[in-house]
Amino acid sequence: MNMTRLLAVIGIFIATAGIAAPVSADTYPARPIQMIVPFPPGGSTDVMARVLARTLQDSLGQPVVVQNRAGAGGVIGTDATAKSAADGYTLLLSSSSAPLAVGLSLMPSIPYKVLEDLVPVSMVGDVPLVLVTNPKLKLDSLDALIAQCKARPGEVAFALNALGSQAHLLTELFQLRTGAAINMIPYKGSGPAVVDLLGGVVAADIENMPAVLEHIRSGNLRALAILSSDRSTHFPAVPTMAELGYPEFVASPWFAVMAPKGTDPKIIVLLNRHINEALQSKAVVEAFAAQGATPVIATPDQTRGFIADEIQRWAGVVRETGAKLK
């Protein structure tokens, strides 16, 4: 090989050395998959991710490693996923709160656009919301709670399990629709919110069912209403908000898997199939049920449409209520 030819070959090698080889959907996955959860360990999102990861790694034949990247209400982990290589080896399992839908209108400086920088893979599940009170307050109905709030304007305290969550915006909407001025106390998660509810520091809480399920069963908390379209199988005697005259109050925190923009559509379809199969397995169904959660089966397109609708819905609630991250 003459010198000119050799230099040309070396030049081509140097120019292409930094370009990663394309990922083949036919051989995917060929190494472990990272599943980012943008919240701390122990919460509903983390529990669902670990349950799903255990079943997925059996069907995919590669480890699925859950990595918690908490911070900024879930934005840090979500942004890290959006900026990851679009090779199918970094996924996001997140909730409907600030990072993906509900709180987006409250956080104008988010560094990504959900449906532009991320690709929906699948839905995962949802959990009911329930309006609960401390039974020591002797409020045995929604009407009794509203009457108490109106009798003591600005004094009855409601816990907000997180600013920018569905519970936060629904509490703002509750105040608007009932005309009852309430005192909203923000918390950093359901755990501390429920502790203060049990201790009588706050009077009421619109809370994720998994966080209060056992406390309701034990009688330490009283459920006044379910914020779902149907009554809870756990507490069939508790009416829905719609039954009580508030049809807007039908909402469930939901969970979805996303991938970075540009991920091979064949990989998205493959992951969707494996996730949906896992969600129908006995192990996952039972583990979710223990958390008060229900698996949700959806295609990537259905997931995209649902998230788009949710973004619009909660943006409307923010506009109407004037809710803020404060």
Swiss-Prot record:
- What InterPro entries does the database record attribute to this sequence? BUG, Bug_dom1
Signal sequence, renumbered to the chain:
1-25
> Cellular location of this protein?
Periplasm
**SUPFAM superfamilies per the UniProt record, alphabetical:** Periplasmic binding protein-like II
What keywords tag this UniProt record?
A: Periplasm, Signal
One Gene Ontology term, aspect cellular component: periplasmic space
Kindly indicate whether the keyword Signal belongs to this entry: yes
* Similarity remark: Belongs to the UPF0065 (bug) family.
- Which PANTHER family does this entry report, sorted A to Z? BLR1237 PROTEIN, TRICARBOXYLATE-BINDING PROTEIN
* Name of the protein in its database record: Protein BugT
The protein's organism comes out as: Bordetella pertussis (strain Tohama I / ATCC BAA-589 / NCTC 13251)
